[in-house]
A protein has these predicted regions:
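Alpha-helical structural signal in soluble globular domains
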Residues: 22, 43-50, 79, 83, ...
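Domain-level recognition of soluble alpha/beta enzyme cores
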Residues: 145-163
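Beta-strand elements within well-structured catalytic alpha/beta cores of enzymes
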Residues: 33, 127-137
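Phosphate-handling substructures
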Residues: 1-7, 51-113
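Catalytic metal-binding/acid-base residues of hydrolase active sites
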Residues: 38, 61-62, 136
Length: 163
């Protein structure tokens, strides 16, 4: 079985659809930034279904760690464009610049990805954005810590964060 860029499980699809129906602040979101892994693209699509929001894929939002674990290796850009035609993939390259088949990225590498994303968002001057990413990435992004990714971090839940 090929575990490269694994899809979202049914439970995750249902959670995302439910959040899209119940999240009252969804209407205030200006743009949706999403990790270009299939499972997060599916999550974002289910949350923001029929909302008319713009989706932008950004490699910096991919799961930690990049490298070795093929479930975290994204498909090529050309394949993603075919699967998710409603997503803007212009900010990513054909192959991920962060992937390495034999070496895990370090926590410092992750922190650098997070800072690059924060700098990008500051430059765009948008006020209300959505970031659809992964638990390990989000825990480091929100709380500057890793560890037990389920402690205090819910799946498919909106967190407020101010840059």
């Amino acid at each position: 079985t090929d575990y490269t860029d694994t899809p979202l499980v049914e439970k995750g699809q249902n959670e995302a659809t439910e959040l899209g129906k119940t999240w009252t602040e969804l209407k205030n979101i200006e743009i949706v930034y999403v990790s270009p892994l299939t499972r997060t693209l599916q999550t974002a699509t289910n949350i923001f279904k029929n909302s008319g929001k713009k989706f932008v894929a950004i490699d910096e939002l991919m799961e930690y760690p990049q490298g070795v674990h093929f479930c975290n290796k994204r498909k090529n850009k050309s394949e993603l464009i075919k699967l998710f035609p409603h997503v803007d993939f212009s900010l990513i390259q054909e192959k991920s610049q962060y992937w390495n088949d034999t070496v895990f990225e370090s926590v410092d590498d992750l922190k650098q990805r997070i800072q690059l994303f924060k700098d990008y968002v500051k430059e765009t001057k948008q006020n209300n954005i959505s970031v659809v990413a992964h638990s390990s990435f989000l825990k480091q992004f929100l709380y500057d810590e890793l560890g037990d990714v389920h402690q205090g971090l819910c799946h498919c839940y909106p967190y407020d964060y101010k840059l």
